[in-house]
Design a protein with these regions (language model features):
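N-terminal pro-sequences and low-complexity stem/linker regions of secreted or lumenal proteins
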Residues: 1-462
């Protein structure tokens, strides 16, 4: 496509664990943006189509003020099945309250999964949705949690069906770094803290290599590098809430119980950096998407697109559908303000886009091609409705720093470490074991882990 030819740098920002209705459902509400073209929420407090019933009690979506939650929300494979509540061949999306009560044992009038945020708490996401494109039919690839969905994002395959504290297996020949290298495409990862890519099996040399740089270097790199030097693909990672050490960064990945405010600030900082140079911005495409819904309510049923279990996978029962919708925003001066993309997409839509750009075909690999034929479209579909010329205006983002209030009284209850937290801790230990010196140079915060301490000298002979 002609417009894709004008794009020189594709920037992908993947955040964590929010549904479309939780972050952007307000776009269609009369008391907020009142954008009837967006598949958001309509009269959520009274609309019976959204009611989650449990033991004779009905639970409705409600306006949730941003802030830290008591705990993470349920979103593993089994509980996502509960949330989507399949009845015969139809997903009713009526089990979110049920899953929450099963997971926590807590019965409250307004279970947090049913909450939706307002523009006041999502100012940057709302800004991008107003000034560029929002995709209201973008689904997590799989109805499960983070690790399988991120595996789909970066390879088109998932060899696991749940998040566990073990290296994430990779299907040979399909991982994004290998694919880009094979085609001579320059790429880079900017990470706030420990990179999520450290959790994948066999990526230590990448994660410790020159293509991985701290996000602190991004402003200077973006300003100093010419268009020819700038990577064609940039992945920007937040500070993950589940990382074992936070040193110099506030978690900003939007993963509950973390509030949305830090993630909104992070997204604003990225946008401000990308748009600082108007000429570079004309050649840039920004994708901001969440990896999965994180247990939050969404009223749109998933797509009936099954998954392929790759050879050597650690599970045997295939997925029958995608996961729920997630927030997805596409920004570029080639996109008109207020655009709403209705194309059905998931994270493999990013792989289709890269394949179109760098291989001349949307078929990144066999599984991505199969999903395309089943109805998953490329991000390039957004550009098909783009402008003939790039916009001369660069809309200014919200200026105020977003401060998320702490909504809890007293300290949160002590909880056992989640499997995601265990996975990050194990990845950090593996990275130190692989090459302690380079790991500490790349991720200096790891020095605070016991595994980073030097071995004591042997005792002197008596």
């Amino acid at each position: 496509m002609a417009i894709l030819d004008q794009i020189q740098t594709i920037v992908v920002v993947m955040l964590e664990n929010r549904s479309f209705d939780n972050v952007l459902g307000h776009l269609s509400m009369a008391r907020f943006e009142n954008r009837k073209g967006v598949e958001g929420l309509t009269d959520p407090e009274t609309n019976l189509d959204y009611t989650n019933f449990l033991d004779g009690q009905g639970y409705q979506p409600f306006e949730l003020k941003d802030g830290s939650l008591l705990h993470d929300l349920p979103h593993n494979r089994g509980l996502v099945e509960t949330q989507m509540a399949k009845l015969d061949s139809r997903y009713t999306m009526s089990g979110f309250a049920d899953a929450y009560f099963r997971h926590t044992g807590s019965r409250v009038a307004n279970p947090p999964p049913m909450g939706f945020l307002t523009p006041a708490d999502t100012p940057m996401s709302s800004f991008l949705a107003a000034q560029y494109a929002v995709c209201d039919q973008w689904f997590a690839p799989l109805p499960t949690d983070t690790q399988p969905n991120r595996s789909m994002t970066y390879s088109g395959y998932a060899s696991i069906d749940n998040t566990k504290p073990r290296p994430i297996p990779i299907v040979p020949g399909s991982f994004i770094f290998e694919w880009l290298n094979a085609r001579g495409v320059n790429w880079r990862v900017y990470h706030c803290g420990l990179s999520f890519f450290a959790l994948f099996d066999g990526l230590h040399e990448h994660v410790l290599g020159p293509n991985f740089r701290s996000f602190r270097h991004f402003p200077a790199d973006w300003e100093a590098e010419s268009a020819a030097e700038m990577p064609a693909v940039i992945f920007i990672e937040p500070e993950y809430s589940d990382s074992p050490i936070h040193f110099g960064w506030t978690p900003n990945d939007n993963h509950p119980p973390t509030a949305m405010g830090p993630g909104e600030n992070f997204l604003r900082d990225i946008y401000k950096l990308l748009t600082k140079d108007a000429e570079k911005w004309k050649r840039t495409l920004l994708l901001a998407v969440h990896d999965e819904h994180g247990g939050f309510f969404d009223h749109v049923p998933p797509l009936a697109i099954s998954s392929t279990i790759p050879s050597g996978a650690l599970y045997q029962v295939p997925f029958e559908s995608t996961g729920p919708r997630v927030p997805a925003l596409v920004a570029s001066p080639w996109i008109p303000p207020g655009m709403v993309s209705k194309e059905t997409m998931d994270h493999t839509s990013i792989l289709q886009l890269l394949a179109e750009k760098f291989a001349g075909t949307p078929d990144y690999n066999e599984e991505v091609a199969r999903r395309r034929k089943a109805g998953i479209q490329s991000v390039s579909a957004v550009l098909e409705e783009s402008l003939d010329q790039p916009r001369s205006d660069i809309p200014s983002p919200p200026a105020d720093i977003i401060v998320s209030p702490v909504v809890l009284k007293g300290a949160p209850e002590l909880q056992a470490e989640t499997e995601s937290q265990q996975a990050f801790a194990a990845a950090a230990k593996d990275l130190l074991a692989h090459d302690r010196k380079r790991a500490l140079e790349k991720y200096p915060e790891l020095v605070h882990l016991p595994e980073a301490q030097p071995e004591p000298p042997p005792a002197a002979p008596q």
